[in-house]
């Protein structure tokens, strides 16, 4: 009887050791899927808001330069959650908006590499031009000094020649 109990406990312990990491991985996968859905939805919402501005410009209510300024101001001030923000670069790699960082805005980032050597802006632009999608790279979180892995959703906004994105740190 005692031997059967010890054997049963050993089997249960082995099952727990095998299954618990799988359960943890399943939760990580579900969380990543939820995060992916959130950032895609947020970019689509931002694009919709930019389209409203572009429509007014196309109807002659404002110049293209003024519409782009309004769009940049919108993205600069648009946030979600506790630290969600948007950025935009031109399809040539010139930064339009990056959480209000005036030291970056207006600079060409096309050749910028992350800490792993990835030309991430080129990847972002290529993904957006191909219809939008997810890109993974390393980036420094606002207020920190070390780069962290980041997953972003990006899409092009053709009326302004922009790539708009947002993401989350993994």
Could you say what each language-model-derived stretch is?
Residues 1-170:
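N-terminal membrane-sensor/transducer module of prokaryotic signaling receptors
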């Amino acid at each position: 009887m005692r031997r059967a109990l010890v054997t049963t406990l050993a089997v249960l312990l082995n099952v727990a050791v095998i299954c618990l990491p799988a359960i943890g991985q399943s939760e990580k996968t579900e969380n990543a899927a939820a995060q992916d859905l959130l950032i895609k939805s947020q970019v689509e919402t931002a694009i919709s808001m930019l389209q409203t501005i572009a429509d007014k410009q196309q109807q002659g209510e404002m110049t293209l330069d003024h519409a782009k300024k309004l769009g940049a101001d919108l993205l600069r001030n648009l946030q979600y959650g506790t630290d969600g923000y948007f950025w935009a670069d031109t399809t040539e790699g010139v930064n339009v908006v990056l959480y209000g960082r005036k030291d970056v805005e207006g600079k060409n980032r096309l050749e910028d590499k992350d800490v792993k050597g990835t030309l991430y802006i080129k990847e972002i632009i290529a993904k957006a031009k191909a219809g939008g999608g997810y890109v993974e790279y390393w980036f420094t979180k606002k207020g920190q000094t070390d780069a962290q892995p980041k997953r972003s959703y990006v899409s092009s906004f053709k009326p302004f020649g922009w790539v708009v994105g947002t993401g989350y740190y993994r």
